[in-house]
């Protein structure tokens, strides 16, 4: 399927006239449309809630849009909790899923009254040492072994640092009940960026059966089951696209097959999607500033891996559109590069693209999640701006670009003078 950018060349030029490239651009209309589709897919479950994975796109304007569409926040750190709180998202609109958790983070989660998802059985006493335990606590499960769909191994939970065994969960529940906890959640994350409609239903079936066993073993009330994230996006044009309606129906079938007959038809379903919620609705907009002709043809951008780490770090594919040349013949082959002093600073390697000239504007697709958030300052590069393309066609700067003053700010105790 052809990937079409959500912005035209004319609109890009309008924004660039005020906000220089590179910048991350987000599509408000697409974000809202997708959030509503998710909600509709799970409308059969009275308690359903999406807790957006803040790590994917930690911007308060994005969190506010999602909150207006009924989403909460999935936070993993003290800072993410602060960000959520600043937007007015707190209490049971937040789930705190952390690991190797500092005391400061756990205390903040307790103070905010959020759902706390314990990664390890030893955290029961850690939590209790801070005061009365919450009435509702979630526990993260690791089944070990491999996680497969049919004959395909999707991931290896036995190698993951997250979660606890079933026996540890049962022991933690028993201990928490003695301490005063009345309701429990069950959580697991077993695969990342899946592009099959079968992942969530398969995971749901596994967690639903686990919940029944835990209820039978401990007498605990399981109030929600958290499917976490893992639904991916079609980064490549030829990849299949997940159908959230089909996924929601698949989970419903498992729910009625396993939970309802076991008198657990009141269990709420939670999700913690990040990539699925935002990735397709973000572009990294950049200007071509250089071309080089040696053993390969190179096109250099004013963006680099510090703006989008995934291609350099994972070898990940991100589609590239040269704005204004969407229908041009792809008769040139380029490496598309950034300016870091690292040879892996390449957005594309031997990619077929239309002929490119210096000054062309490119849109790098699917950067709405794990794009800006994974940025860094290597080589003294400064993080880019973030811009929201609003539903009415206007645009808003929602994070300014870093300046050299920002970069040097943490040296404020020193005797050095940093000029502009």
Where are these regions (language model features)?
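Flexible loop/turn segments at secondary-structure boundaries
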Residues: 58-61, 83, 125, 146-147, ...
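Active-site loop/helix belt of alpha/beta enzymes
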Residues: 143-289
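Glycine-rich, aromatic-flanked loop segments that form ligand/cofactor-binding clefts
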Residues: 132-146
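Charged (often Lys/Glu-rich) extended helix/loop segments that serve as interaction or gating elements
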Residues: 264-420
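Conserved, mostly hydrophobic/aromatic
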Residues: 31, 55, 77, 109, ...
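Structured core elements
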Residues: 72, 95, 117, 138-140, ...
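A charged N-terminal "starter" segment
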Residues: 1-116, 121-129, 133-135, 170, ...
